[in-house]
A protein has these predicted regions:
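Polysaccharide-binding and catalytic clefts of secreted carbohydrate-active enzymes
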Residues: 54, 179-320
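Bacterial N-terminal signal peptides
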Residues: 5-15
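Aromatic-lined substrate-binding rim segments of carbohydrate-active enzymes
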Residues: 76-177, 288-301
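Glycoside hydrolase catalytic-domain groove-lining segments
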Residues: 281-296, 300-375, 393-394
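N-terminal carbohydrate-binding accessory modules
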Residues: 21-86, 93-95
Length: 497
């Protein structure tokens, strides 16, 4: 097994930080007091939301979203001689050394386990003994990248789905319910990002509980007036009963999703707004039912730990749908800082804090991947990643509505070859264990700065300025990468490294 000496340097920097002596065993600030309950929970103190440690001290979580994945196999081989236990323990220490004080994704990232490489039981055991705060995954739903060709979304209204959720929860929660290092539970990453597919998958199943439930919602929304529905959807049903019994489809087009995410305008056809509103109401029915089933299953075994729900794309749910799931979550968990759907109104409406659950800060891919495949979040250089990280660290840590952030990052360069997203996502270390020292050292400083910013929350106007600076910078990088890709596609003989 290779030794990674850079960690010793990083750890020394952290130990010498001005905050080190002020922290309790969990990483909470001993001079900012909340209620001592014996478990992580949330409180609003002097206008700022905090996590509160089991000892009753304020905590703000900084993590990386994807430290333990199945696409780290090369690093396990080259750095840890194939020893998964050494890799798991070493990864926790490397995260600590970089200034990450918790693991929001837990012992493994469910959406990046397609290869079945990670020994999940071993990972759970290592994390139980690691004494680092973490959130445990209860993956009741899949990310779209986990879906195999032809696989449909589950009918969440079926008895089969309820039994699956109850079984999954019963396998894990009873043994975790008294663990003080567990902050809570989450249900997986981004299942609602493809909401149109969810609606169409459930409606097309004839005689299914999901179809019956969703068509019933539509019948109530149109007050039983089938002609009104026909006018919106361009159909010719004689009655809602005919619609239900025929097996015929109401299909939701892709523009619904693209419009909600800010990528496309509202369609111009008559009835488009009504169709769009119908889609949001149906999605709300699906999401609320799913969260209620999962919440009730968890609370049968555990009354204390936090429930985060899914780590969802920030515009997946409108305000009304956030309100629908409010009773079943303790923390709001959008993935990104968003201009399309700012989360502040949700925090205010639910009177619950938020944390950013999978925040990208740019990825550096080999240029052949940028030109040949979809390489999400590409930026020219690792320096540009630091530019975005700095802007985000300021924006998020100075916002009193956030209790933490999970950066979309990996420890080691990913080595899977199926998709650019997986083969190209860069880590803080190469797959041979070589540190990217300027990146590592700078991120340590930024993570430390975030902890100092917590005592200096900004006003709404100041936060808007930071938010605008970040998004304007991100848009410029996107434009540069579009220009690069266009140039290279037009000039395939140009050589580059």
């Amino acid at each position: 097994m290779r030794t990674l000496p850079i960690f010793v340097i990083f750890a020394a920097l952290l130990v010498s930080s001005p905050h080190a002596a002020e922290l309790d065993v969990y990483g909470g600030f001993t001079d900012i007091k909340g209620e001592k309950t014996g478990f992580f929970h949330t409180e609003k103190i002097d206008g700022r939301w905090w996590l509160i440690t089991p000892e009753g001290n304020a905590f703000w979580g900084i993590g990386m979203a994807h430290p333990i994945t199945g696409f780290t196999q090369s690093a396990v081989t080259f750095v840890y001689d194939g020893d998964q236990q050494a890799w798991l323990k070493g990864s926790i220490e490397l995260m600590r050394g970089l200034g990450y004080n918790c693991v929001w994704s837990g012992p493994y990232c469910p959406e990046r386990l397609q290869s079945d490489f990670v020994d999940r039981s071993l990972a759970e055991e290592v994390f139980r003994e690691a004494k680092i705060p973490y959130v445990f995954p209860l993956p009741i739903l899949k990310h779209s990248v986990e879906m195999v060709p032809g696989e449909k979304r589950p009918d969440v209204f079926s008895d089969r789905f309820a039994a699956f959720v109850n079984k999954l929860v019963a396998e894990h929660v009873p043994r975790l319910k008294d663990d003080r290092w567990v902050m809570g539970y989450y249900y997986g990453f981004a299942p609602w990002m493809d909401d149109v597919t969810w609606l169409n998958d459930l409606i097309e199943r004839k005689d299914s509980p999901g179809r019956e439930r969703l068509l019933g919602v539509l019948e109530r929304r149109y007050e039983g007036n089938i002609e009104a529905l026909n006018a919106v959807y361009g159909t010719s049903f004689q009655s809602f009963e005919q619609l239900k019994q025929s097996g015929a489809l109401i299909v939701y087009p892709d523009w619904v999703k693209r419009h909600k995410m800010g990528y496309a305008p509202m369609a111009e056809a008559a009835g488009s707004q009504k169709l769009y509103d119908d889609a949001q109401a149906l999605l709300g029915e699906i999401v609320e039912h799913t969260y209620r089933i999962a919440h009730d299953a968890v609370r049968r075994h555990d009354q204390n730990h936090l429930i985060f729900g899914c780590y969802i794309k920030e515009a997946s749910l409108n305000l009304e749908n956030w309100k629908r799931i409010g009773p079943y979550i303790d923390v709001i968990a959008p993935q990104h800082v968003s201009q399309v759907f700012p989360i502040d109104p949700v925090v205010e409406a639910l009177d619950k804090p938020a944390f950013i659950s999978d925040q990208p800060f740019g990825n550096v891919y080999p240029l052949p991947l940028v030109t040949a495949k979809n390489a999400p979040g590409a930026v020219p250089d690792h320096l540009d990643r630091l530019v975005l990280y700095d802007l985000l660290a300021n924006r998020i840590s100075k916002d009193p509505n956030f209790i933490g952030v999970d950066f979309c990052a990996v420890l080691f360069d990913q080595s899977h070859e199926d998709k650019a997203y997986e083969i190209g996502q860069p880590g803080f270390y190469t797959k041979y264990g070589e540190p990217k020292q300027p990146l590592c050292e700078t991120v340590i400083g930024f993570n430390e700065q975030m902890l100092s910013h917590l005592r200096e929350p900004m006003s709404g106007e100041e936060l808007e300025l930071l938010d605008r600076q970040f998004h304007e910078t991100l848009d410029r990088y996107r434009a540069v990468m579009r220009d690069r890709k266009g140039f290279l596609l037009r000039n395939p003989r140009v050589s580059y490294r």
